[in-house]
A protein has these predicted regions:
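Sec-dependent N-terminal signal peptides
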Residues: 4-14
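Trp- and acidic/polar-enriched beta-sheet ligand-binding modules for extracellular glycan
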Residues: 20-45, 49-55, 120-123, 146, ...
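Disordered, acidic Ser/Thr/Pro-rich linker "stalks" and the adjacent N-terminal cap
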Residues: 20-129, 154, 230-232
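Extended extracellular/luminal ectodomain segments enriched in beta-structured repeat modules
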Residues: 121-123, 132-141, 200
């Protein structure tokens, strides 16, 4: 009887996933070959004491602000986040405090969320919670794996498939490429147009499959962030 119940559960899960659309990236933009930790330090210095930048630091900052990937993290350019609000980012587990859920949404390309269970992290998830007044989301952007440098990225696991939930209902499967680059997914329109009495809402990302790391079983995600409408 137990075996029959297990088979029925498996069949139900397969049928559920079969009804969920699969999405491939609409674009993948490579990370430029540069020292990302130096970029991080220069951007931090610019935010606190811009006039103290050296000529070399200023040149690096200009490069960063013009780069289609790095500008998301280190420039003051307008984006969905001019109006976008996130109440919390939580996770089912984390390897340690320095790999906590919020590291997947801290706008730093040298930190990451790393799941904390035994094995490769299949079934672990990140959940993003939004107030009802939040502008609507149309795009999910992902840096897959621990991208701060090549060795760390290669040694740790990366996500192959993410099951995306909207308000705890399966919404789409995101097929991620095995790359350090920025992957963009068009996900329709999420959130509420009429925000006066709109309830809070959420997006969850559950690991379905992974690309194994060369050295560790741990699976990492550097950033998941968003673009959308209803701003400016």
């Amino acid at each position: 009887m137990r075996r029959v119940m297990f088979l029925l559960l498996c069949l139900g899960t397969i049928n559920l996933y079969a009804q969920v659309p699969e999405l491939d990236p609409t674009s993948v933009v490579d990370i430029p070959y540069t020292d990302l930790q130096v970029c991080d330090r220069v951007a931090m210095k610019a935010s606190t004491d811009y006039d103290a930048l050296s000529d070399v630091e200023f040149a690096l900052l200009c490069f960063v602000e013009e780069n289609p990937v790095l500008s998301h993290f280190y420039s003051g350019n307008c984006s969905w986040y001019c109006g976008g609000q996130i109440d919390s980012v939580t996770a089912s587990s984390a390897l340690a405090d320095r790999y906590a859920a919020e590291k997947a949404h801290d706008f730093s390309i040298v930190t990451a969320w790393v799941e904390g269970v035994e094995g490769n992290g299949v079934g672990e998830y990140l959940r993003y919670s939004f107030p009802g007044t939040c502008p609507r989301i149309t795009t999910v952007l992902i840096h897959n794996g621990y991208v701060k440098n090549w060795d760390v990225w290669r040694d740790n696991g990366r996500v192959k498939k993410l099951l995306m939930y909207y308000n705890d209902e399966p919404y789409a499967i995101l097929n991620l490429q095995d790359t350090m680059g920025l992957q963009s997914f068009d996900v329709g329109v999420l959130g509420y147009e009429d925000k006066d009495s709109a309830p809070a809402w959420s997006i969850k990302f559950e690991i379905l499959e992974v690309y194994p790391g060369k050295k560790y079983e741990d699976t990492a995600i550097t950033e998941i962030y968003f673009d959308g409408i209803d701003v400016h």
